Amino acid sequence: MTAKFRILVLNGPNLNLLGKREPGIYGAATLDDIVGRLQQLAAELDVELTHKQSNAEYELVDTIHQAMGTVDFILINPAAFTHTSVAIRDALLGVAIPFIEIHLSNVHAREPFRHHSFLSDVAKGVICGLGADGYEFALTAAVRHLERSSNN
């Protein structure tokens, strides 16, 4: 049976170090833990979920381009690229796939340079400060958005 929706999860630089890097800020869960929980939830929701993590901006841009016509929604934690990447913003706008921006920490309670996002104003929504649970909330919200859109 074909999945109801296809959702792409993108994770940016240094997220491969989750569980080791600053656990007081980012939590103890590894990226594999987070993606595993997401895969379980996706199966329950009848969603096909694919994941990519990269420390290279161009790889994330290429993956976004390749998603056109094959993905219904994107969940993205751009990490440090949040504050610097016009290229990722333009790629997301170019493919016109709705997306939710995710951050493990509350970026607004951190250093001032982390307060600006190049993506937030064009995202369907932003989830920050809820740790690894934010990914699951984002997946659930994406599915609800897609269900509402397909019923109209």
UniProtKB/Swiss-Prot annotation:
EC number(s) reported in the record: 4.2.1.10
InterPro entries in the cross-refs: DHquinase_II, DHquinase_II_CS, DHquinase_II_sf
Any one GO BP annotation for this protein: aromatic amino acid family biosynthetic process
Pathway(s) per entry: Metabolic intermediate biosynthesis; chorismate biosynthesis; chorismate from D-erythrose 4-phosphate and phosphoenolpyruvate: step 3/7
GO molecular function, one term: 3-dehydroquinate dehydratase activity
Gene3D superfamilies assigned: Dehydroquinase, class II
Function noted in UniProt: Catalyzes a trans-dehydration via an enolate intermediate.
Full protein name: 3-dehydroquinate dehydratase
